[in-house]
């Protein structure tokens, strides 16, 4: 039997374990949350790499204050570098595929659902493939990357603008004054701009944790495109008036399986190294599992 562990910086309340036959292999699968403790995460990674055949790492953004993208990228690299004996994955490529798959499923099954919708991405850079997919259905898109990544009070309003920003974002701070961008008045103005953008959107693409600080006035009637939504969070979104949640993380083996954990399971079962699995391989596997994106109504 092969062992797979998914270590998440999310809550330990949602831990689980199960045995299953998967792609011709018998797997023992664990999900372990560390409650945003980097120290505990490192300890678990070092302990489990002596026993696991593959490890998935899920970084949950609750513990980051915006702007945070650079902090997240830095921490992900530090965590993956801890594991040297066995394959380790964040499931980023699979997450992109799952989100695109979910959006196309909704578009086809609910009758041109995203056609001409007003869509706000908290991060276009983190969801570039998804942005390209949604752009096939609507050009009414905006991206909050400058606002949330760099603290600059500006939204991007086209896919071309996002591509230009992605190519040159690292130069922006050369002329921006960090002290000014970090000042309380600028932070308040940025939050006002983000809330205004949410109010004008019909669809919000964001990590579910990043919506915790918004209320019914902001989210009433919205569709949220996200991943790995627990029942507790779904209930809270319902209290805030969210109309529908599109969740790319499939429900398999009686659990919601995060992309990082599912990718680790695939790696362990196939023996392929991270990055060597093709997009078509992932899609074929999802079809074999008879998995479906989750459309949830709070």
Kindly give the residue locations of the regions a language model identified:
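Active-site rim loops that border cofactor/substrate pockets in soluble metabolic enzymes
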Residues: 148-203, 209
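Short, charged/polar "capping" segments at the starts of alpha-helices
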Residues: 13-16, 64-65, 127-130, 151, ...
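Conserved beta-alpha
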Residues: 94-156
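Short, polar loop motifs at secondary-structure junctions
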Residues: 60, 125-127, 208-211, 228-232
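Short, charged, surface-exposed secondary-structure boundary motifs
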Residues: 150-157, 233-240, 253-261
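Short acidic active-site motifs
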Residues: 40-44, 192-193, 213, 233
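Short, T/G/N/S-enriched strand-turn elements that build extracellular solenoid repeat scaffolds
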Residues: 212-218
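Metallocofactor- and cofactor-centric catalytic cores in central/energy metabolism, strongly enriched
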Residues: 1-113, 137, 203-206, 220-228, ...
